[in-house]
Amino acid sequence: MQGKVSFFNEGIDFRLLNKIKIKLWINEIILRDKQISSNINIIFCDDLYLSELNLSYLNHTTLTDIITFDYTANGIISGDIYISVERVKENAIIFSKAFRDELNRVMIHGVLHLLGNKDKTPKDKVIMRNKEDQCLILFQSLNA
């Protein structure tokens, strides 16, 4: 079952390109993981907003590009994914990636968290990165 994927801005003026393709991609990733989703909200914001969430909810004082709030219950995938567009832009420069490619990686990173993937240990980080890479390849094939 395809869930609803929605995009919002919080305090910034940002326009996501290819919304329909991104929604299809996210739903395909969930389907391939043999899971069911209801609502996934992706909220684009700035560093300040995400830093405040990070401090309030996780008690972290570091900058981050993404925070995922997982509301999954009874096997139905649901959550809010907050993404700092500022942080993604800066990371794209640091990692010599196109902004859109880095943004896609961060979005799918949040979705993978909703699917139960972790990235706390070095081993988990490698597994997560490999899954992100596989998802990005799928995105390219959907856009071919």
Regions found by a protein language model. Give the residues of each.
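An acidic/histidine-cluster motif and surrounding catalytic segment
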Residues: 1-104, 114-144
